[in-house]
């Protein structure tokens, strides 16, 4: 919005030439981060008071850790603060004509809406289950598949008209079409190694990455500050990849596929980092507010969508290794429990408690130890992910 305003002012008179600074992506990225940070810090206390007044407190289930029982009643659904700060800051600072940012915003707010309904049912309607799993996955799948069908052609072409033409051609050809190299699966640490996916393969991969990332972040969000800081670090790192991928010069030098317009995602990533740090101010131990599903599902979906656009799905799995391991710990725990119950008549557990962060708590780690150590691991994983920019 401010970019368009600056361009309009420059057209009116040469005296407004200093507004040329708005043309620089890096300047707008810094301003987006600062704007989201300030919005979050200033609005945070008011949002917390509002959630407290509405009695939107976190319910603690009976099988939870004893040390968590004192958290019962802490305001939840604080993710609305994060999403609000991200949306306002992004809309202010990004190029409104950029399709990729609109897609990420739509996916983020769509998953946020799913999380909001889930939280609302748990907290207000006093339904401990919230949205049923099938219902939640259905709506996640709808958003994921729609986003995938658009992105598969959007990444292949630079104009909306051509995107529609490609979609029609794909249908007329019997759902069979070759995609350009930039739509392939990139393998990190190797020069120009890209596996062609085809339309169906791209859609399936996109669906799995977006929905999987969303749920993985949600499963990680179980301790004060545990999920939000890794989201900030991974999001900021993806912003670097977006900047490189969207630059014809840097992408050619670093042997990355050039995707016109992808660089504008740096604005969204910066806003997400700023909003996340603002939320951490209130979410650090002992937390004054929890993000709830409205925040966790949305942020995870955003990370997955950005990774798809900049073609860094595997790197996302590396940098977001904590999210991956947390999700796998739940799946393995449930699978092993069901298998042993059928085979031996009683369910057995691989971990003392899932997700993994609760296993470490049961093993004697303090909550703050788990959180900070997971942060350190994420920082190292993000550095490894960033080395793929040059080590190829």
UniProtKB/Swiss-Prot annotation:
One of its GO terms (molecular function) is phospho-N-acetylmuramoyl-pentapeptide-transferase activity. It catalyses: UDP-N-acetyl-alpha-D-muramoyl-L-alanyl-gamma-D-glutamyl-meso-2,6-diaminopimeloyl-D-alanyl-D-alanine + di-trans,octa-cis-undecaprenyl phosphate = di-trans,octa-cis-undecaprenyl diphospho-N-acetyl-alpha-D-muramoyl-L-alanyl-D-glutamyl-meso-2,6-diaminopimeloyl-D-alanyl-D-alanine + UMP. CDD domains: GT_MraY (cd06852). It comes from the Bacteria. Its EC number is 2.7.8.13. GO terms for biological process: cell division; cell wall organization; peptidoglycan biosynthetic process; regulation of cell shape. The keyword Ribosomal protein does not apply. The keyword Cell division applies. The chain crosses the membrane at residues 24-44, 76-96, 100-120, 137-157, 193-213, 225-245, 262-282, 289-309, 314-334, 369-389. Pfam families: Glycos_transf_4, MraY_sig1. Keywords: Cell cycle, Cell division, Cell inner membrane, Cell membrane, Cell shape, Cell wall biogenesis/degradation, Magnesium, Membrane, Metal-binding, Peptidoglycan synthesis, Transferase, Transmembrane, Transmembrane helix. Belongs to the glycosyltransferase 4 family. MraY subfamily. Catalyzes the initial step of the lipid cycle reactions in the biosynthesis of the cell wall peptidoglycan: transfers peptidoglycan precursor phospho-MurNAc-pentapeptide from UDP-MurNAc-pentapeptide onto the lipid carrier undecaprenyl phosphate, yielding undecaprenyl-pyrophosphoryl-MurNAc-pentapeptide, known as lipid I. This is Phospho-N-acetylmuramoyl-pentapeptide-transferase. It comes from Paracidovorax citrulli (strain AAC00-1).
């Amino acid at each position: 919005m401010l970019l368009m305003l600056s361009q309009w002012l420059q057209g009116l008179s040469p005296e407004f030439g200093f507004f040329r600074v708005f043309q620089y992506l890096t300047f707008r990225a810094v301003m987006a981060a600062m704007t989201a940070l300030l919005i979050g810090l200033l609005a945070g206390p008011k949002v917390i008071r509002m959630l407290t007044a509405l009695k939107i407190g976190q319910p603690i289930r009976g099988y939870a850790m004893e040390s968590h029982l004192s958290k019962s009643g802490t305001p939840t659904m604080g993710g609305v603060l994060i999403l609000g700060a991200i949306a306002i800051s992004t809309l202010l600072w990004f190029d409104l004509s950029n399709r990729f940012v609109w897609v990420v915003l739509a996916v983020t707010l769509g998953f946020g809406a799913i999380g909001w309904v889930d939280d609302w049912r748990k907290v207000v309607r006093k339904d401990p289950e919230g949205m049923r799993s099938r219902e939640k996955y259905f709506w996640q799948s709808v958003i994921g598949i729609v986003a995938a069908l658009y992105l598969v052609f959007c990444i292949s072409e630079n104009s909306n008209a051509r995107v529609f033409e490609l979609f029609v051609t794909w249908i007329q050809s019997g759902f069979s079409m070759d995609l350009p190299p930039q739509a392939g699966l990139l393998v990190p640490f190797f020069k120009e190694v890209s596996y062609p996916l085809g339309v169906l393969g791209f859609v399936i991969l996109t669906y799995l990455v977006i929905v999987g990332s969303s749920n993985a972040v949600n499963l990680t969000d179980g301790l004060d500050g545990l999920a939000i800081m890794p989201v900030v670090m991974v999001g900021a790192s993806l912003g670097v990849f977006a900047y490189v991928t969207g630059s014809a010069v840097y992408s050619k030098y670093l042997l990355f596929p050039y995707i016109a317009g992808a660089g504008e995602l740096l604005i969204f990533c910066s806003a997400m980092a700023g909003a996340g740090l603002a939320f951490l101010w209130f979410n650090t131990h002992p937390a004054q507010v929890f993000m709830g599903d409205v925040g966790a599902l949305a942020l995870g979906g955003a990370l997955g969508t950005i990774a798809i656009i900049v073609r860094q799905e595997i790197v996302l799995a590396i940098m977001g290794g904590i999210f991956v391991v947390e999700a796998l710990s739940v799946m393995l725990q449930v699978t092993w429990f069901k298998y042993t119950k059928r085979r031996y008549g009683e369910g057995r557990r691989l971990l003392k408690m899932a997700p993994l962060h609760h296993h470490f708590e049961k093993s004697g780690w303090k909550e703050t130890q788990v959180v900070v150590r997971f942060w350190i691991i994420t920082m190292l994983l993000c550095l490894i992910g960033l080395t793929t920019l040059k080590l190829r």
